[in-house]
A protein has these predicted regions:
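Short beta-strand/loop motif that positions the catalytic acidic residue
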Residues: 182, 188-190
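Primarily recognizes the serine-hydrolase "nucleophile elbow" in alpha/beta-hydrolase
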Residues: 117, 121-181
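Serine-hydrolase catalytic machinery in alpha/beta-hydrolase-like enzymes
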Residues: 42-132
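Acidic catalytic loop of the alpha/beta-hydrolase fold
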Residues: 192-197, 224-225
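N-terminal cap/lid segment of alpha/beta-hydrolase-fold proteins
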Residues: 1-40
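Catalytic active-site module of serine/aspartate enzymes centered on a nucleophile-bearing elbow/loop
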Residues: 220-221, 226-243
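Conserved alpha/beta-hydrolase "acid-adjacent" motif
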Residues: 174, 195-201
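Catalytic histidine neighborhood in serine/cysteine hydrolases
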Residues: 202-203, 207-225
Length: 243
């Protein structure tokens, strides 16, 4: 991991951009996180729209988490931002736009091509490097979308002990079986009127999770209308399980 820039944000948070091989990422840590008192880490998931486009939303989440005593980090997803384009993913995005513009159902082939290439091993490699930093000590949580990444990480990554998942992205059928293997505590957010989300599929996915502790928090409104108090509840969830 190589840090390529550093700045101190107004809220007393240190923001550092890094590269891990060809993977760009950003790490936010509270200034009050010295090596003598390492803090828990939350991995910030996001849709494959590019870190620059997602930055305002990501940094807002990072600042809130820092105020609660957490470090946060995120990486650029394959085929997005400045990373090389993947033809299969680009074709899936075009097929998705055509289907939605025509009001047609989004078939399984499009969903699989769009979601399955998003590389969970890259998140694990980032986690390996982040946990070597003296100011980060774990435990580790995952927060956000794409929900399929959160599911897969919860299954294969034992260092993640709690997750806040956003039920607002397409889910390959294979993920429903994997959801049954998830056993960590879950806090799931669902926007009830999300125009791009299959509400029933989101409810079925929640039902499939194997966790003994799981809660579903549904709110009226579209995809970007998550109320502030929903974030407050998610923060309390992480404080219970990571502190």
């Amino acid at each position: 991991m190589h840090f390529i820039s550093e700045q101190r944000l107004d809220d007393g948070v240190l923001e550092r951009e890094f590269t891990l091989g060809e993977i760009p990422g950003i790490l936010w840590t509270p200034v009050s996180a010295p090596a003598s008192a390492p803090v828990p880490l939350i991995l910030l998931g996001h849709p494959p729209l590019g870190l620059r486009r997602m930055y305002p939303r990501l940094v807002a989440r990072a600042l809130d988490s820092a105020a609660d005593g957490f470090a946060t980090a995120t990486i650029e997803l394959p085929g997005s931002g400045d990373r090389p384009r993947w033809p299969v993913v680009e074709q899936a995005r075009s097929d998705l736009r055509r289907a939605m513009e025509a009001g047609d159902p989004v078939n399984d082939e499009i969903v699989d091509a769009l979601i399955l290439p998003l590389a969970v091993p890259e998140w694990q490699a980032a986690l390996d490097a982040l946990l070597l930093l003296p100011e980060i000590g774990g435990p580790v949580g995952y927060s956000g979308g794409v929900i399929s990444i959160g599911i897969r990480l919860a299954v294969v990554e034992p260092r993640i002990c709690a997750a806040v998942l956003f039920a607002g992205s397409f889910v390959p059928r294979a993920m429903f079986e994997q959801a049954r293997q998830v056993t960590i505590p879950l806090h799931v957010l669902l926007q009830w009127d999300d125009e791009g989300n299959d509400r029933q599929a989101a409810l079925d996915l929640f039902d499939a999770f194997g966790s003994e502790e799981k809660s579903l928090h549904a709110h009226l409104g579209g995809h970007t209308g998550v109320p502030q108090f929903a974030g407050d509840a998610a923060a309390r969830f992480f404080t219970r399980h990571l502190m």
